[in-house]
A protein has these predicted regions:
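Enzyme catalytic cores with a strong preference for nitrogen-chemistry domains
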Residues: 2-269
Length: 269
């Protein structure tokens, strides 16, 4: 199928970024946000809609995540979303994953009415406002997942601040990096994030989608400010800070691999 510009539509891949405000503990409210955003992505004919780190539970859940009943309810909510969204864009969403007596900060890939893959966070932050070592187990490094014609690697937040995870994903066939985050704001944080992510892009030669939460939880403020980088580190999409925003990024296949089209670049602090 050809577009009006004569491009082969099979060489396009659309990712919708859902930069939204999840509420800790409000599984039904967060579920509703997912459904509403998914409908927008479906209308955009996106291939995938992505949500930030631990979105279904809200972040940072602290000791609430240690309650077995809450873990089961969160997993059930993700399963319900998968079943309800079987016809349309795939979904990537953060949530807890239990395996025996181990609990993981994870990223679920939902498609065809089912959970197709679960990515587990490897590097757990244990400093400043984070004490994930107490709450979660460190997962093995997972390879990329396939959605349609694109192989996507998802280092979860802290994992993208270490070169080893991205290196492994690139070596195992990832074509694009999707990084879900719950990254709190402080002055100068945007430049720090982008500099680190540019390093990952240059090292891997892959485009990168950085997706962050927005909103507040206890003493933490999540500023959003999600962005997309092309190989070489070029900034091609910048979402606003401190507000919810849903944006669709169109990737096109070239001889060098997948490249993101240039979109809106919001002013950042």
């Amino acid at each position: 199928m050809l577009s009006r510009k004569g491009l082969n539509m099979s060489d396009e891949f659309k990712i919708t970024l859902a930069q939204l405000n999840a509420t800790v503990g409000d599984l039904s409210g967060n579920n509703q946000k997912v459904m509403e955003a998914w409908e927008i992505a479906r209308d955009e004919r996106s291939d995938l809609i992505a949500f930030p780190e631990m979105f279904i539970t809200g972040y940072n859940p602290q000791d609430l995540i240690l309650k077995n009943a809450f873990q089961k309810a969160a997993t059930s909510s993700i399963e319900q979303i998968a079943a309800a969204c079987s016809q349309g864009p795939a979904i990537a969403i953060g949530g807890p994953f239990c395996d025996g007596d181990k609990l993981y900060n994870s990223y679920y890939i939902l498609a065809g009415g089912k959970i197709q893959a679960v990515i587990k966070k490897h590097h757990l932050p244990n400093e400043e406002v984070f004490d994930e070592v107490r709450l979660f187990s460190s997962g093995n490094v997972d390879g990329p997942f396939q959605i349609g014609k694109m192989r996507i690697g998802s280092p979860i937040c802290e994992d993208a601040w270490h070169s080893d995870i991205v290196e492994t994903l690139a070596e195992t066939g990832a074509q694009t990096l999707l990084v879900p985050n719950g990254s709190p704001y402080y002055r100068g944080k945007t430049d720090i994030r982008q500099n680190v992510m540019v390093s990952r892009v240059v090292e891997s030669g892959l485009p990168l989608v950085y997706l962050n939460l927005v909103g507040g939880q206890d003493d933490q403020v999540f500023d959003g400010g999600s962005f997309v980088l092309n190989p070489g580190g070029e900034l091609v999409l910048q979402l606003p800070q401190f507000e919810e925003n849903i944006a669709t990024c169109v990737f096109r296949k070239s001889a060098e691999g997948w490249l993101a089209n240039t979109g809106k670049k919001s002013r950042i602090l």
